[in-house]
Amino acid sequence: VVHEWGHFFSDQMSRDFSVGGPHSLTDLLDPRVAFSEGWANALSGLVIGNDRYIDTSGQGQSSGFSIPLERTYFDSVSGWYSEDSVAQIVFDIFDETSALDDDEIQLSLKDMTVALTEHLPPIAATTTIFSFMKAVEETSPQSSSKLLNLLKSHEIALATDDFDEWGSSETNDASDYTSATGGRTSNALPIHTEMTVGADPVLLCQDAVHGEYNKLANRRFMKMTIEETASYRFYAESTGTGFGRTSPDPDFYIWGTNGTGWAAE
């Protein structure tokens, strides 16, 4: 219940650009999905006061499962595309009363609420572990180095002494993970590709190596800066086939820093 309420809270009081869909700890996910699901898992443990996420189901709630929030699940993936990594990071930051861990940071649920409602919404980047951590850093600037160390412990931001909301310096390209058929994605990075208004077109590739709809590299992200108020035209065309279609029709969405969105389908 807390997990699902968390989705409601983030949608109504903060920002959440997750596309939803099926997910598990072994999935390499769209980073928006990884953040949304991992954060909601951690919230459940924080609110209830349990270092495990517990989900019940069936007649009389007689079945279900639980996931540890203080350690990595035995066959989960690690990285910015992992809901397990996100859950552990969020839980470690805000488990202020926990004596069960040795992490070096303990912020409060009030701090998390401030980060989500005041600092996350104005951030231009989409909702991922990177934009969330930037919002937390703005809430608690003195915790910056500890937040970075926590990211590094989950194979995130390994090659940098700083991090930003875009994941600009990310080097974890998910190449350590293969699909059921032995494939590896080559389209995980950069997380956000720079696009310059008026410049040459940018080639951006997608794939379904690790599954479809909400998995890593199914959708790609770009960023751009508009310097002047004017009318601008954006155009996307396919250069090949994919996802079982002989003639793909690319769709794209444009989001402004104020949260306004435009769809081209």
Question: Could you describe each region identified by the protein language model?
Answer:
Residues 106, 115-135, 189-265:
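Acidic, Ser/Thr/Pro-rich low-complexity intrinsically disordered segments
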Residues 7-8, 14-17, 90, 96-97, ...:
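Solvent-exposed loop/turn segments at secondary-structure junctions
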Residues 25-31, 72-79:
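Second-shell loop/turn segments in exported
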Residues 21, 33-35, 44-73, 98-116:
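Short helix/loop segments within enzyme catalytic domains
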Residues 1-55:
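Zinc-dependent metallopeptidase catalytic helix centered on the HExxH motif
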Residues 31, 80, 241-245:
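Short consensus segments that form the blades of beta-propeller domains
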Residues 48-52, 85-86, 231:
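Loop/turn elements at helix/coil->beta-strand transitions in domains of secreted/extracellular proteins
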Residues 73-196:
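Pan-zinc metallopeptidase signature
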